[in-house]
Amino acid sequence: VKGTAVVYGGDDRYFNNIFVGGEPDEGWKCGTELYNGFTSSMEEYIEKTSVYLSDPDKVSGVRQPVYINNNSYLAGAKGFEKEKNKIESDYDPKIRVSKENGSFYLEIDIPEYGLVTDAQQVRTHNLPIPRITEAPYEKPDGTELVIDRDYFGNCRAGTPTAGPFEG
């Protein structure tokens, strides 16, 4: 261990996901709306913390940046207020898990209008570098990380749909 640091929340990344709500309880939230109030870039974080450099207690109150984009929110799930490309809908995808002949199947009804489809493929160059480690997201051998396959190994387009399944 070369050092330690306190992480006060944030420094998270959510790209190309599907969030599904449900029956809300008081105080319950689903989706990325829990990040409302967080900064959304390292530049914004530095700008907000620079005014408190003489008071570490106030610096710790500034939320670290989160990087959230190209997600779909269904059945009451809500997105981050600064997310630029998202779909929010009350559509219920009726998610089910069924079992046939010893195998399990995920069933989901996709809305006719689809899910976010003009997203970027997740790659090393579009995953912002973490604040504390300052190390890029890459493969163990140091080459570029490219998420170009879906859950089943099918090729993901240069503009993939939200969620684990392409097409």
Question: What is each of the regions a protein language model found here?
Answer:
Residues 1-120:
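Glycine- and acidic/polar-rich repeat regions and solenoidal domains
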Residues 69-71, 148-150, 161:
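Acidic side chains
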Residues 112, 123, 162-163:
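A short, sequence-level motif marking secondary-structure junctions
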Residues 117-158:
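Active-site and glycan-interaction determinants of carbohydrate-active enzymes
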Residues 159-167:
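Short, surface-exposed, low-complexity cationic segments
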